């Protein structure tokens, strides 16, 4: 006890944080602490600064430096260590005699701090000896002590003094304390371990480490011990000065004899307390080791009698000084044997140990090793939390360190810490003891045997001898390393780690221990020599013991000690970088101690860069090779091969062959890692290549490092191996990175190259194994990455047999990285794999700089092109139907005399046509979709297709895109369920309820588990956890129990007739049956409340998922809307979590989990239908939709039978496409083809299969058109044509046009069908079958025929043809007339095409006006509105069209323009408008422009107002447009010849004029007319005559056709196109020309000619529509000559007119959509939505705004102002023939047109 206490007092790590000197008893009490605590204590000891009391803090750095030098001294340091050891044994006796040694007690420590300065010298020696002795017996404690001593030698001395001062009587007691404290150490040092040999030595260290860990005070003291290195510093615990002297004395003894080191420890423990001080003083250069020796002494002496004996031996040795140690290894061996025999630790044979020590001392390399070791130890101290003790391993590892030399013992602790712990044996056995401290904790038992072992000396010699270093993988010393290997044959190179018996191997033993806690200490020791600074950053890895052992074994075998000089005490911090230390090629092992590698770092790096370099490159290459990326470039031993093979290329410091040989194992790890980023290095060339290819992925090694973190043990194992090289990896800059500290960085280097996170695990593992060398190579580029990489990859052969070593560490490491494998394994890896597609290696590009050839420039001016397009460039054009035309230029070389290189002549290449499906194959389902679904015969094919799709969804799983959704799995299942329900719907002809088979089918789909038990009494909700088993938490039976008092109160309430009180009394008493019976006779609200209360208190409180049952009860009670609150409470929907304070139930689960009960709720509702349950399902669907559960929501909508199918722009639409979320993801609707096809199947099942003649989802027609385009692009033109025909048939069959049947849709269908006819072989058949299609879509020929004949051929176009048909016949003769009729008709393309040429010509003439018109509106949409303007100027549809049409109609319109009908038709109206506009350019432009602006406005304002504005404008324009023929003919009256002039007066004009005329009197019209006449005098005259004639005729015709017109007007109100056409008829007959213009603005269908209700109002001076009173107010068209003035007013009126919706409808008839527009107009506000959702805009667009747009742009605002009167005239302004005629004349302007107008005037006059 006393001895242990003394040791604790001597060892700052054991001292209490308060620095009070603990009593021996206290120390003993602390000793029982677990190894983890010991480790912690060591960790604390490692950090000198933390403790104020710790002497280390006070100790100046000089002392620390002084401590390190002993390592460099071969004989003297060893002797010092021996002296310390000897002295420690003496203190052991002394401790036994002197209880005061109990310094561990905090209070004692405080006293000691005060007393130590006085007594440190006297008692310090004794204590030192005792502590050393104790340390030896207490192998576990010894490591800590050694570390503490290294860091706190002075403190220890002081502490001893204080201890002695405070407790002189406990001098004898120390034995027991040591026995207690150092029992472990005693076992390690005292008995079996110390005599055992190197392994014993490490065991001793291990034992010592444990004691240190045990006492918390010791831990704090250990931290203090770190400062002990500075004698000058005095810690509160004990005076530093005295202790320093004691330590010096102790070191002196150690210097005298290597073997006497331990003797001195013992002796000093008993008698020569002053010696330890003296030794410590002498070894001020290596105070760390001395301090460790001192701490070792006390633990050993206390540990056991054997330890005492050993202390005695050490005391003798101490008296003999360290020289004695070096002089007599036999004595040391004897001491060790005695100690080991007493100690439990595995003792290394004394003979072995002595021989090893002797060899170590004899070796010239000892000094080098000492230096390295000294550097390594300090580095380790810095590197590890408990490294301080390791840094001073002389005490802990003094057994081996002493025999070797002062430097050697230090090296041993280092090697012990880094390498031996990494061995699997050590790692397995020692990890628990707190490897964090380092070797001290991990190898206390081993340390005891090691001190006697000369393995350290061998390590030194090995350090010098890279060859020998290879031999000893366990310790830095060569001898130790080799014997270690021999002993640990099972480990090829890591044998040291496996065999702990030998002294050198003992070092390996500690590493395993350290691997668990501190892999860095051992590794750190080796790499510390090379890269001490890097190690500190990697203190994290200090906990990993394996790295330290590896450095030892590796340094000993390779030139690890060679870097010894470099491995000054600073090296210790690098231990974390031991792998980084790899840079020193020879010292792969020494890479652990960066010292060895530092010298070679630069060289290794250079070697890596230049594999040819034999020597320096060899070492780095060895490191590289050892690193998982040992390049095949370097051979095993030879310097030249070493760069390539990268096996331990000897560092410049050591012989090349030995290092190469040794380094082959370790060098591969560090050397390659650090050195071979540029140059491939691997154990094998293949491995190297793999590494090289993957080197760019070093960054990825971090992941590998993370992986290695999981296998911290493997890292340690690797460290045991030559990992030391990995431990110290050299960065290209020559800096050693401490891979060990990094955790497993070195291991990653060897274990695996950077991993590709995307690579398959199998491949990654194999690749990492094969590419491990590569891991090392990349580090040179970046040391940290290399380190990380090292961590992941198995250790490439650190030694000759890297695989064995790697395996050994793996075995020792609990967590084995699959990548960690022998270097041979990695080397064998095939480069191919390394370059696997998953490999992270950067893609290799086999590219050669293209030769720059000179082009021959052209001489025709193209050479001036700044883009130099004359050089030629590939041209690719995507055409219709999936056709692709490509043309690549030809570069023809031209050779000329005297020119070495040819010049290139660019010439066009061959144009080739390809099919898109050949370039981009389109995956089609096994069963082709049978669409379009036209009849019941498709049912079977549809079911087969649905089944195939369902199977596909089930087999393919969740798509990558769907996985982005947080609930992708549930949504996938719900999608499959939706498809299955649609299949059932198709199977049962659109029925989902009623019959038992349907219920059974639904049950099998919604609740598959019930299908097996169809007779189950449970409903759909059965999947809910058996409700029958659910019972209220408060026992429902009790709640229903009869309470006499409650029943009495209930009866009393009922006697009084107060049923309400009776109900609530029953509720309060939980008499639910009574409450419900009474509530059933009361108001419904009471019943609902009672049920709600019942659900809340009984159902919701029950265990299990009762949400669906609660919802069902709510539905039964009539709480339909509130039923969903049972699934997701309102608070949860608001984002809050409510907790009930009544029932005391907290939120047992997520409130949103109730959404998952939707299926149960649906099943319960379907099996228990109630009157309003469909509303509940609708609410449930909306709830699900709000949370993004689209498929589930649509299922509920389908069963609710109340869902609204509509366009995306319809806010009331519940479903646009089944399975598509139009609310949250509207942009995806058009991209999901499956959603459209599924919706088409639903439409087919609910309409055709249900008995309806046609499909009834109007909004789906637009999607069908899109699908047809998609099919055409795929080359499936026949199917696309079928869809076009189906759309046409649907449009034709409907008697009530929908807003979705807009003109965009019509034009789109016509455009697509026209293209398909032109590009398909069966076009003839298409033409034959086209008539109906043409009527619907506006086929050119069909429209022309209808226009000429006046038939209502355009049924689908809603009678637009009618409006112009009357006029059509007559106007068909005129070029302008056909255009007008065409324009009026939704289908006008045919006619328009005929008139298109003239109109286009006029368009050019009137470009200004036309241009202006489009500018007012959207370029695409506006043109249509213009025509519409004339056709249906006031129709909101037009506005709607503009909005909705933008996306849809615009493109089709453009396309249609290209189509002859479209083009002809569109230009016509715009041209006339333009001419009208031109005639009234100035004034009309402004007003009309507003009108145009209005059309854009329509979407927001509504179609009605827009139509009016447009109507006015459009009517003026369309009036112009309808007049356009007239205008085309000339601004003079001649335009009427086209009937366009006349058309404006038609009913179409009436509608618009109503709005516009209402806003503005006829003045506007006269102004326009005047303007137009002013523009053209002839036109003015003609206009005047025409005005009179038209007025007269209009009055007559209006009267005659009033009745007919009224009927037609009513029809037109529904179908605007019809009215417009009717206006054409009146225009044709005479006074009705204005109506014709109106018709031109409106659909052709309206045949208002015969029934023209227009009459000429003399007061208004315009034609007035009798049926439309508002038209009388609109006088815009009255004065044709003042067109300029009139148009502005009209425009203004049009602007004001927008409000009227009625007028829009009249124009609407021109385009079928108008009627539908009535509803859509609000939607028109949104142009895009209108495509699908707002049909009205499409309708407006039907006039083909595109062509109009083309024409419109030319139109000027002023000219457009002219046209507005015409639109007004066409509907409302039509009453004024003059207005009608005037605008056309103005537009026509041309003489030819004038002639035509004249003809027309004549007709009108007649």
Swiss-Prot record:
PANTHER family: RGPR-RELATED (PTHR13402), SECRETORY 16, ISOFORM I (PTHR13402:SF6). This is COPII coat assembly protein sec16. The lineage of its organism: Eukaryota, Fungi, Dikarya, Ascomycota, Pezizomycotina. Residues 502-524, 571-587, 638-658, 1697-1710 have a biased composition (Pro residues). Residues 461-470, 1591-1613 have a biased composition (Basic and acidic residues). Residues 489-501, 610-627, 793-805, 830-844, 1686-1696, 1747-1761 have a biased composition (Low complexity). It is found in: Endoplasmic reticulum membrane. Belongs to the SEC16 family. Residues 340-352, 360-374 have a biased composition (Acidic residues). One of its GO terms (cellular component) is endoplasmic reticulum membrane. It comes from the Eukaryota. Involved in the initiation of assembly of the COPII coat required for the formation of transport vesicles from the endoplasmic reticulum (ER) and the selection of cargo molecules. Also involved in autophagy. It comes from Aspergillus terreus (strain NIH 2624 / FGSC A1156). InterPro entries: Sec16_CCD, Sec16_N, Sec16_Sec23-bd. Keywords: Autophagy, Endoplasmic reticulum, ER-Golgi transport, Membrane, Protein transport, Transport. One of its GO terms (biological process) is protein localization to endoplasmic reticulum exit site. Its main location: endoplasmic reticulum. The keyword Protein transport applies. Residues 1-202, 263-305, 318-846, 1418-1647, 1663-1806 are annotated as: Disordered. CDD domains: ACE1-Sec16-like. It is a peripheral membrane protein. Disulfide bonds: none annotated. Residues 23-45, 73-91, 128-154, 165-194, 283-304, 412-426, 662-671, 737-753, 1456-1465, 1503-1521, 1528-1540, 1547-1559 have a biased composition (Polar residues).
